[in-house]
Amino acid sequence: MKIIIFTSSFLNDYMMKRFVVTLALCALAIFSVDAKKEKKLPKDIGAINERILEEGYHLYMQEKVAWIVEDVFFANQPEDSDNIGGWVPVTHDGQNVQGIFFNKEKTKVLFEVSINLETGETSSNATVRELTEDELKEISLRETVIGAVKTLDDLPAAPEGCSFNVNILKLEDDLYRVYWMLGTAQHNLIPFGCDFSYDCDSKGNIKESRKYHNSYIPAMLIMDGSPVEGIWHSHTQLSPFITPTDIALFLLYGYGNSPLTGFRVYSTVYGCYFHFDANSFQIIIIKE
């Protein structure tokens, strides 16, 4: 897993002295879990956490790329931007990514944004050209796997002030994990919750689906005019571990935008905290 080393002048102590409850989730019930019902952590918890970190990092990077691509597009909109039908990310190697904006007929590229992930440099090109065969395949694949969501029932709705962002991870040949997680333009807020994912093939056949949180968990970064010293929320059997979406959302909305360098998830199943430390990019298990 490739890790970007972040630098920060913020607090480095992950053992936070005070926490702010981010959701009224029957807090007393969280701590009244019968110890006899708590499960032991899996023997492969280290490997589980590594996979969570890796997927969380990829979700974060995909969202950052999307933000950059859209910012460049809106700052340099082509004259025929009304004919834009959508855009797709195209990765050429581990260092360079392009955002391809195509027309409604899905025949031509109207605008391109290029990003160097190592340097952060961006460039744009408004030269109209034909879509390549590979680009057409990418558009078709994304439409198919994202459209597969229509076959699922009882999905959470995006709360007011938020919308769903969709990110796709390729797990192996012809198997994709499609993440739906919240995004928001609201300031001083991390939009945890209402997220889910499913695994499907290139034809949109869903193999497995999972919900991470059933409800919206807005984590405020400012309370009573001051930055909060810590944030946490609880997970039940629905999702007993910290999630890739938790990690991605904290990196996007919390880390670097507040003094916070981490957050915690309390697992009612295992009776412990999973603490994500962004500076060291690791998950630390803290027993009560």
PLM features per residue range, with description:
Residues 1-43:
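Bacterial Sec-dependent N-terminal signal peptides
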Residues 37-175, 217-288:
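Active-site-proximal loop/helix of nucleotide/amide-processing enzymes and allied scaffolds
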Residues 177-180:
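N-terminal, charge-rich interaction modules
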Residues 28, 104-105, 185, 203:
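Generic structural motif
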Residues 183-218:
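Short helix-loop boundary/capping segments
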